[in-house]
């Protein structure tokens, strides 16, 4: 009898498992961040592809390409700050802005470094 009762309780406990947590706002913000990050990278790639690489150093061309994509960078920075405030509601606006600046700074540095490598490869192919 006790065994049957224990089996019944265990089977009922399995039926009442908590549903997976649904976080539509967080998922939406993550998708928006991913799209803006991708758009930022595509913008820099397009600027590099269209750039005249015959005269200027690769670093200068890369810096100009990143600067030309500043509107997307700014939108990404705002979205990162919004995401930080969503995930860390106790953060002050200054903390969220600092997180956004640091996060977007890392992305910008990587895009610039990759752009330099791409430009140098193209310049070497021209020789």
Question: What role is predicted for each listed range?
Answer:
Residues 1-8:
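Sec-dependent signal peptide recognition
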Residues 12-14:
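C-terminal motif of bacterial Sec signal peptides marking the signal peptidase cleavage site
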Residues 16-19:
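Bacterial signal peptide processing site
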Residues 23-45:
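Post-signal peptide N-terminal segment of mature Sec-exported envelope proteins
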Residues 33-36, 50-55, 60-62, 76-80:
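Extracellular/mature segments of secreted proteins
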Residues 63-127:
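Compact alpha-helical subdomains of small soluble proteins
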